[in-house]
């Protein structure tokens, strides 16, 4: 550990790799609700968060498990199509609560162009939530609807063992990964239908 009179111990959450306080301060200065997006290996989580002196207040939240439970999503919770659908869901939920604009908060995730984090953003914007951004950061349409996964599945199907190993999670739920784009559109339609009044 460093020593000397000029050494400063970083805040605990910074040491633990959980919070970038410089970024957080910049986001809070905007005065807008934050669209907080976090990703794990198997899932995405999105929240609309308001700052309060006593602690941040979560107004609405959505999890990819919700897509599976309430809308019949059979794909993986950590891929780009599920991220877009989650964004669509959190966007409609925010509008339902009267929140029409937000600023994106990706925490310590690297801002990689085309990443699934930005698929969540696209979904929220498509729902009608106003979030400042550049469209250049979005994933391509084929990644959003899962066509790239379907194409890979078609190629891998020739090797039955690897195919079942790679896509066992899809198959056990009754979804052929080659049909993921069609399934994506079905689930997207269900989300839109549920929030039809919000869109009106």
Curated annotation (Swiss-Prot):
Name of the featured protein: Large ribosomal subunit protein uL18
Gene Ontology CC entries for this record: cytosolic large ribosomal subunit
Entry-linked InterPro entries: Rbsml_uL18_euk (IPR005485)
Species, as recorded: Thermococcus sibiricus (strain DSM 12597 / MM 739)
Biological role: This is one of the proteins that bind and probably mediate the attachment of the 5S RNA into the large ribosomal subunit, where it forms part of the central protuberance.
Gene expressing this chain: rpl18
Family matches, as Pfam families: Ribosomal_L5e
Transmembrane segments: none
Keywords: Ribonucleoprotein, Ribosomal protein, RNA-binding, rRNA-binding
Record GO biological process: ribosomal large subunit assembly; translation
CDD domains according to UniProt: Ribosomal_L18_L5e
């Amino acid at each position: 550990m460093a020593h000397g009179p000029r050494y400063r111990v970083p805040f605990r959450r910074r040491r633990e790799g959980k919070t970038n306080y410089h970024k957080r301060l910049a986001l809070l200065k905007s005065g807008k609700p934050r669209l907080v997006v976090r990703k794990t290996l198997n899932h995405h989580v999105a929240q609309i968060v308001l700052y309060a002196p006593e602690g941040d207040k979560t107004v609405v939240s959505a999890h990819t498990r919700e897509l599976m439970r309430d809308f019949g999503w059979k794909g993986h919770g950590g891929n780009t199509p599920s991220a877009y659908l989650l964004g669509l869901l959190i966007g409609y939920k925010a509008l339902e609560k009267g929140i029409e604009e937000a600023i994106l908060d990706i925490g310590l995730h690297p801002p990689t162009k085309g990443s699934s984090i930005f698929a969540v953003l696209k979904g929220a914007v498509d729902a009608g939530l106003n979030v400042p951004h550049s469209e250049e950061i979005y994933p391509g349409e084929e990644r959003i609807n899962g066509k790239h996964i379907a194409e890979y599945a078609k190629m891998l199907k020739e090797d039955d063992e690897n195919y079942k190993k790679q896509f066992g999670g899809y198959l056990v739920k009754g979804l052929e990964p080659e049909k993921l784009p069609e399934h994506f559109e079905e689930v997207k339609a269900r989300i839109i239908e549920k929030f039809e009044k919000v869109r009106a």
